[in-house]
């Protein structure tokens, strides 16, 4: 769910939702309807789009509302992954419980800041990370759409069959992103599900779990693989970060 929310948010942010709708046939109508109703009178100034100058005013209005709607949902679904995986050490991404919704402020590291956007109708201050019934329904539909999209699955299986996080070719080492290092330049050790890895070992265990997210028969390992796919996208200890 964390990956799905990120994909949609980024597509919305850069005005590329048509990639999902037209390119992959992902039905975004439930999200669009929810966003237009929930943020009907909200200009969503903090969620303006970047890029795509060809957007007309109507599309722009709808997309900024979708951008805000999926951003709030992303905060909520990511908190569930973070809670389930304390070893990821990503608690700092959980921000909703630091907000004073009456004052419209957030407290970070002991300092209070005013929020630029104070309209969060789907957040319950007592349970800020709980999805509303509508948000849960939207995520369930999106999950089914992504999982049942034949074209998307075909593209992902192509990447898994042909690609890897690193490759030795013609005497050269090719690798994605950056190898995590300590300040002294030595390889940084990163804990993945209770075990420490660094360098080549880190690349191999992360790739192994990505593949498990698609192919593992053990439900626990498959779930861990899905969580790792989200982790490698945004953790500072991930080579792909």
Identify what each model region corresponds to.
Residues 1-241:
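Feature recognizes metal-dependent phosphohydrolase scaffolds
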């Amino acid at each position: 769910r964390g990956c799905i929310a990120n994909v949609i948010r980024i597509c919305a942010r850069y005005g590329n939702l048509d990639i999902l709708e037209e390119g992959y046939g992902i039905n975004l109508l439930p999200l669009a309807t929810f966003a237009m109703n929930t943020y009907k009178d909200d200009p969503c100034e903090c969620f303006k789009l970047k890029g795509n100058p060809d957007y007309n005013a109507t599309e722009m209005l709808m997309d900024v509302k979708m951008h805000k709607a999926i951003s709030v949902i992303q905060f909520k679904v990511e908190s569930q992954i973070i809670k389930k995986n304390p070893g990821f050490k990503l608690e700092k991404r959980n921000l909703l419980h630091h907000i004073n919704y009456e004052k419209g402020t957030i407290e970070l590291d002991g300092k209070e800041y005013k929020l630029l956007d104070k309209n969060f109708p789907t957040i319950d201050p007592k349970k800020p990370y709980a999805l509303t019934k509508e948000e849960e329904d939207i995520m369930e539909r999106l999950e089914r759409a992504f999982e049942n999209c034949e074209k998307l699955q075909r593209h992902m299986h192509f990447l898994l069959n042909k690609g890897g996080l690193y490759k030795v070719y013609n005497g050269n080492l090719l690798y994605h992103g950056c190898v995590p290092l300590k300040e002294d330049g030595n390889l940084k050790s990163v804990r993945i599900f209770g075990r420490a890895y660094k360098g080549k070992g880190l690349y191999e265990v992360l790739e192994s779990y990505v593949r498990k997210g698609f192919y593992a028969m053990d439900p626990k390992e498959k779930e861990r693989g899905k969580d790792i796919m989200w982790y490698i996208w945004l953790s500072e200890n991930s080579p792909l970060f």
